[in-house]
Amino acid sequence: MKIGIIGAMEPEVAHLVESMEKPSSTTIAGIEFVAGQLAGKEVIVTRSGIGKVTASIATTLLIEKYAPDAIINTGSAGGFADDLAIGDIVISSEVRHHDVDVTAFGYEIGQMAQQPAAFIPDAKLVAAAQKAVASLGEVKAIEGLICTGDSFICDPVRTKTMLENFPTMAACEMEGAAIAQVCHQFDVPFVVIRSLSDNANNDSPVDFDEYIVKAGHHSALMVIALLEQL
């Protein structure tokens, strides 16, 4: 089984690359793809860059060049669930865009025209992630809605609006829905796994800088544990 793994930033993929056996690196359009073995599986780890456009480019290149059987998106996120702390993990139950609005044409808020309102992760990948939670010790993990947009969220007014639009949102980030949409187009199974680096509030810029390495490491450990379940 060949698995593609996508993270936006170096701290989000560093532990994965360091843990790989026989890594081989290729760069296409400024995006690095590292192929090798991880947890007994053939993997391609990709550092996409930040945001929905670069994530879409990276996902398309990954699928076209390497033909993975499934894709895992890993990394950090801002937390919206009251019972989660920095470092805890959200496994996607569904993924949506929070910054898309074509409701004038009868679509749901967050739904791009001619696309589903929500992108649903692969049930087998989610089940493997659930089993992997037990190996993480004291790190808490839940399933929940993950929303994506091209903004770093730290404004309480914007947070309030987002929760009005998506009241069950557990986390927000900047790549997941774009990756999920590309996977949907190519019919490739996916799951998004994110560790919280901040709580999407006024302290988020400080928290993010302080905790991004911790969040990236926790998310990477979760990915490795998931691979061991496949």
UniProtKB/Swiss-Prot annotation:
Gene3D superfamilies: Nucleoside phosphorylase domain. Pathway: Amino-acid biosynthesis; L-methionine biosynthesis via salvage pathway; S-methyl-5-thio-alpha-D-ribose 1-phosphate from S-methyl-5'-thioadenosine (hydrolase route): step 1/2. Substrate binds at G78, I153, M174, E175. It is an enzyme of class 3 (hydrolase). Its EC number is 3.2.2.9. The keyword Transmembrane does not apply. One of its GO terms (cellular component) is cytosol. NCBIfam families: MTA_SAH-Nsdase, PRK05584.1. Belongs to the PNP/UDP phosphorylase family. MtnN subfamily. This is 5'-methylthioadenosine/S-adenosylhomocysteine nucleosidase. It comes from Shewanella pealeana (strain ATCC 700345 / ANG-SQ1).
